[in-house]
Amino acid sequence: MGGALSTDDPEQRASSVEELNQRLAHRFAAKCFEPLELTHLKENFFSRALDQHGIRYWNEEILSEFLGIPDGAGSAAAATSDGSLDAGPVIFRMVSYLGAFPFQNTMAPTVLTFESMVKVVVLLTERYGKVLKRGKKDRIKLLFGSLADVGRRDIITQLKEATEDSLESIGPFDPKSASPSTHNTGFLVDQPLNDEDEEDDDDLAIAALESLDAIEVFKHDQRIDKTVYESKISLTTFRRLLTLLLVTAPLRPLGRVSKFTTGLSKPSLDAVHEQVDSILAALEPGEASDGIGYKSFSKLVSTSLPYLFDPLTPLFEHLLFSKNLDLSRKRDSQTTNGLTNKPVPTPPSTPPISPPLSPVISTGGFDSRILNPAVLSHLSFFVSTNVHIPNIFRNRTHLHPVFSSTEHGESLTSFSHHVMTWQAPSILLVRGAVVSESSEEQLTTIGAYLPQPWKQTSSYSSRRSSEVPDPSTLPCLFELSPVHTVLQGSPSFSSLKPNMPVSHFSTKTGIAIGCVIPPSSRKSLGSDLHPKPAGGGSLLIDSALENATFIVSNGLNGPGVFLPPGISPVLSSTSLTASVASMSSSNQNITKSISIYNLEVWGIIPSTSLATQLDGSGSPIEKRDAISLQRAQWDFEAREAERRQAINMKVGGGEADVPTGRALLEMAGIIGDSYYSGHHRH
């Protein structure tokens, strides 16, 4: 086989590539799909496919209509007047590129045949990990190549030309042929001009071909494109994709896409556009006009938007369920004809009923002044709340309203009562205006994900220690607007000194996230008591909950809880140290003083099924959820308040003994500042 594949005959090599493409698609299908899923995929594809010369294929209109994506034409026309959701051309461009994998050099853009669709569904859903050697790293390369449109000739025109040329050149379909030829000259940018990153790209394709004994034909002439690193993604293309991803982020498996893409009000669209602008603002300034390069795209996605493309999974998994397919009719027919009496498992004719997967905002709380669907979608792109299913829209996370400065008052006593009694992870959100010399007000939204409960200062000595960083157990500090910024938690934060907790609460100095806490003593006065910034970033909020200071550092403040921006905690220890050292050389600090308008804390309640814990014998442990624990704590505090009121404060009965009695109670920790939750005054 090797001799045949290494032939110098261009036509035979092209035929070999077509054969390999067919075999690879079959391997993808066998490895990544259940038989029933493949049956539904075939039904969906062939029942809608166009036919030309015996070739069954989809065009852009069919794809957009089936997925429910607005594309400005057909029944999936733009749902918004400004066309910001018209992502049909972008998605079709992506699938036309990915359908040629791993032969983008000679086959992209490819006609969207069934074999191409099989590869597309694998690469755009969670199944990609079964076929890509380096998982997310390889997928980011493929996604960038599928989106890059700057440096290529007009993509839409080329897609149409490629489809027409391919269908016209193949002639009548020969039933004896293993597969029709859909060969074309490929994207101009994919023609090899240099060998930069050749080894990585070759490995990516070889990983897909090594089991097919097809390495020689690949190495001979079909190298993956190298000039993809010289091309760029236009801002318009990325903006449309971001808008679609933000709007469809809550999409559940088999859910209706039109529910999220139609009927959007202007305020809802404005909120989406604010988040899109924030993410785009995180790119290098020059890329706004020239396009987004591979390095910037890869850095942005891998370090601060790791779950950005998660909405594509439920979107393309629609192809794996057909409403028209009902195998129960076939079973009934077989039973009636006496062919078999053996029960045959049948797929459901309607989508199975499953609990809502979107984060549920608990009823009976406050109306948020910060959280809205767009902000929630933005958070889902980088906040991980579960090790097995990181995405908050997929792991059945519930968000519980814990504290609102608007609802509960701008008081640390009230904050303590509501937040310090919450024994579960939480998200802190702050909305306000950046204080500057300019008269123009600039709104900002910052926050922190805290995977551990808020605790008293003295409780931070017992912190988690783990060798393998799990995103759901690492804190993160972030800015949602006006510039998307994520400071990931350092995987070594558990080994930091006890005076460097993730979060710190004090009735005297306020709230501190990611700071060094000076030791308290009788000699410490004034500014000596205030927390100091540390690591890649910190957040300080004064005791009146009126002002905040947000600091982003490239290493000037030494080690800390958070890494500098643009660094991922999943790097090896050597790479992590080198990255932090290179960032530290810039010695840049960005400090924002913020006048707080709203401060909110949202508790995270994981899915009951995902939160189940087992004891030593393997039996499930009965757990009380955070809401019940908080109510129990409040009941305890109420009883303690009644008990304290019943104590005779006069001790000896005289007025002069009142201070003595109060001093004794303070030393016992029953009243006074030492009791962290205090007694809240309303």
Curated annotation (Swiss-Prot):
Function: May be involved in a process influencing telomere capping.
SS bonds (residue pairs): none
GO CC annotations, alphabetized: cytoplasm
Pfam families according to UniProt: TLD (PF07534)
Listed transmembrane segments: none
Organism: Ajellomyces capsulatus (strain NAm1 / WU24)
PROSITE patterns per record: TLDC
Region of interest (Disordered), residue spans: 167-198, 331-358
Top-level taxon of the source organism: Eukaryota
Gene symbol of the encoding locus: RTC5
Positions with biased composition (Pro residues): 344-358
Family: Belongs to the RTC5 family.
Keywords on record: Cytoplasm
Protein name: Restriction of telomere capping protein 5
Domain named TLDc: residues: 369-605
InterPro entries assigned: TLDc_dom
Location within or outside the cell: Cytoplasm
